């Protein structure tokens, strides 16, 4: 997706006191003074006053509904998404407040919004906090939905709609918290550290027109030192009644490969003594399926296992990589637990052959390989060769997408602020760092030298398995208790981090 960016990407920056427009590297001061809410170009004053009077939870529910109804569907093509509509909505949301706003548009319609509340002394204060949200959502099969996927319908304190879980509720919460910090700054109570909110485009397509594009082409547009994004806050219920709340501290990497498999050409009527590429492909496939791939034995995996409160034998075997079972002990998280503890190899695409009477001499097999922290591309290729044994002499490995896994330390001020807020919210619960099998924009922050955590607060008590099952699902929905809880805990984390330098 990175190759979709067209030359001359449009970048627009708006600063509340002296608006600027930046186009193709040129900076032009616009002859419009700083406007308060209700003045031309800045949205109606009544809306801003009404939003200030609402609770943080009410504001977030309202904004979430509006984002869902936009339907910024990303079908993995450059012209989909239309996230500029969300950028327009959110820019109006901050109207009249002392923030700087930059619009970054690598491709028409694919706008990411960067909103900054400056700290009291940004030149000397601690590292800023960056909130990485995204406004695009995955497509829907409307025939499989029982409600309008873009209607943001509320029933029994639950909102239904595409993106409610992934991740518009958190994006809305980030906007509301940033707005509240800006409102306080307007009243003379600026935070010690700066706060940056990003409403990014194109996350669902790995961000070729979103945060990864910004990191590659405009890394100066936002600080990468300390970031929060999606997928934390769900619960793990232990077998002895314990409660743990997860914080995502890392993500698996991608090491996609195409194997070129050589065979013997010949006429299909005389196969004796020849091995076609199709037959050899089947042998390669079987060898890969039978192989043992690297497993996790680090403390992040160990803390995840301990949260389930298994018997001592099961716990020890899982932690030390000697487990031989099917992960059924994890129940609805069996596939999740296996994925975050292994280098996984999914055989996804195979090609070979032409006329039915010709034995082909070439076949390809594509592998979607997801790696653990510390496993690099050379390790992956070596593991493939080892798995193939003698078959390796007939195979050439082509590297496709290559991204190392990323992980952040938990010995940081930001993690401690998250831990304190979550244990206050859920008395008696433990906070458990976990690796996530998928990807998010946090990988960009980590690769640029920062730390990043997947954050949330699930007041409904939904388990990690229940939350995970909602991702990209038909009839995606979220309990409004979780929306309110997320914004309230995020506000506490931000307040703690921004005021303690």
Language model region names:
Residues 125-196, 478:
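Active-site metal-coordination/substrate-binding segment of hydrolases
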Residues 219-220, 226, 233-242, 248-256, ...:
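Acidic-enriched catalytic cores of C-N bond-cleaving enzymes acting on peptides and small amides
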